Design a protein with these regions (language model features):
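Catalytic cores of alpha/beta
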Residues: 77-86, 137-147, 192, 196-210
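Histidine/lysine/aspartate-rich catalytic loop segments that bind and position anionic ligands
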Residues: 129-182, 186
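Glycine-rich phosphate-binding active-site loops on the catalytic face of alpha/beta enzymes
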Residues: 45, 92-100, 151-163, 209-228
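Alpha-helix-loop-beta-strand connector modules within alpha/beta enzyme cores
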Residues: 51-77, 109-131, 168-192, 235-240
Length: 240
């Protein structure tokens, strides 16, 4: 089995910074420290409301980073323009609601389908690999293939919440396995993310065919107690 890549999402370093309106802690410093400690990529979400990562963060991190940058954006003209300018290695198109605390679910691929298809084509022509953040259902995976995405990122939030709340996750695990298998059969690169902890990442790493985990909130939270370097190394060991 090939190693699962670890993408470190540093959004919530910016959340802490913005809580006081100061210039620390530095998302760039977090990105470079993650890179130094064998993260395979860095993920940032440039939201329309700029509630954590902002345009300057994106510019500076992209210019300094040596490992791939995975930029999460909504399917809008503004974000398409920014992504085309910055040319990150990966772009993950995600749903976005202004009132949500965090991304609440996968993209509705039957909404704005024509725009999505044109957006994906432009981003791919600009040498970025494009991922769609979707629920683990077979219909959406087939639609992602039809839209000519390179990758899918499976939303693991429900599965992770079942584990956190000590409830049975067997049915959801089977659902995720079927979704991941179909993605691979269709030639899509399969990533997984949202709500992942040490425990849930360890269980999901048993599924053959996941190429990458993107982990942020829990990882940044644990780093308060153990440090960012140690937390990244622990995740690396768990998902190897």
């Amino acid at each position: 089995m090939s190693k699962i890549r670890l993408g470190v999402n540093i959004d919530h370093v910016a959340t802490v910074r913005n809580a006081r309106g100061v210039n620390y802690p530095s998302p760039l410093k977090a990105a470079l420290l993650a890179q130094q400690n064998k993260a395979d990529s860095i993920t940032i979400h440039l939201r329309e409301d700029r509630r954590h990562i902002n345009d300057l963060d994106l510019k500076v991190i992209k210019s300094k980073l040596k490992i791939p940058l995975n930029l999460e954006i909504a399917a809008t003209k503004e974000m398409l323009k920014i992504a085309l300018k910055r040319k990150p290695s990966f772009i993950c198109i995600v749903p976005e609601k202004r009132q949500e605390v965090t991304t609440e679910g996968g993209l509705n691929l039957r909404f704005k389908t024509n725009f999505l298809k044109k957006m994906i084509k432009k981003l791919k022509m600009n040498k970025s690999r494009v991922s769609l953040f979707i629920e683990p259902n077979l219909r959406d995976i087939k639609l992602a293939k039809d839209l000519q995405a390179d990758c899918i990122e499976i939303h693991t939030g429900k599965f992770c919440n079942l584990i956190i709340n000590k409830k049975s996750y067997v049915a959801e695990f089977k659902k995720l396995t079927k979704a991941i298998n179909l993605g691979n059969e269709l030639g899509l690169e399969v990533h997984a993310g949202h709500g992942l902890t040490y425990e849930s990442a360890k269980i999901l790493s048993r599924i053959t065919g996941i190429k990458e985990f993107n982990i942020g909130h829990f990882l940044i939270g644990e780093s308060i107690f153990d440090g960012l370097a140690k937390t990244i190394k622990k995740f690396r060991k768990i998902i190897k």
